[in-house]
């Protein structure tokens, strides 16, 4: 239960920190963090396996579960942020397209998007946050 809440709060903080548009450098670091999670899960698994062999405090099946759950939880945190950032990136790409190729309607779309986009972003973050509760419940408590 404690680990479930820790990952849930980490996910909420990471989703709601306000950094929803990434630069090229941030995208590169974000992609490297996915690779880092995979490598970290493998290292954690080997470390846990060696710990069980030297000092048998948990069973092998529990060690396998912990390795899977920790890796899946970190991947889920990154995937939730990826969803939000991709929605913002797609929307800004649509607006750039309209500014360049649909300039006669861009002003109307721009004023409309300035009115609705903050509330739609909050709605998207709420939906993704509710989905993350279900994901972490499935990983840690089910």
Indicate where each model-derived feature is located:
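Loop-to-transmembrane boundary segments
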Residues: 107-133
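Membrane-helix interface motif
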Residues: 41-58, 86-95, 140-142
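N-terminal signal-anchor/start-transfer transmembrane helix
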Residues: 1-24
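Juxtamembrane boundary at the C-terminal end of a transmembrane helix
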Residues: 130-142
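Juxtamembrane inter-helical linkers in multi-pass membrane proteins
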Residues: 93-113
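Short alpha-helical packing/oligomerization segments
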Residues: 58-100
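Transmembrane alpha-helical segments of multi-pass membrane proteins
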Residues: 27-41, 62-75, 114-123
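Hydrophobic H-region at the start of alpha-helical membrane spans
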Residues: 2-5, 31-32, 122-129
């Amino acid at each position: 239960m404690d680990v479930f809440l820790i990952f849930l709060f980490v996910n909420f903080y990471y989703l709601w920190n306000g950094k929803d548009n990434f630069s090229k450098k941030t995208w590169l670091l974000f992609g490297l963090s996915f690779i880092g999670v995979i490598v970290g899960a493998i290292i954690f698994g080997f470390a846990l396996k060696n710990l069980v062999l030297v000092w048998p405090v948990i069973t092998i099946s529990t060690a396998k579960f912990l390795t899977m759950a920790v890796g899946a939880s970190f991947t889920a945190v990154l995937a939730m942020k990826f969803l939000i950032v991709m929605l913002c990136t797609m929307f800004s790409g649509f607006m750039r397209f309209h500014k360049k190729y649909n300039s006669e309607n861009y002003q109307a779309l721009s004023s409309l998007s300035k009115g609705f986009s903050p509330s739609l972003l909050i709605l998207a973050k709420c939906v993704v946050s509710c989905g993350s509760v279900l994901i972490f419940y499935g990983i840690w408590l089910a």
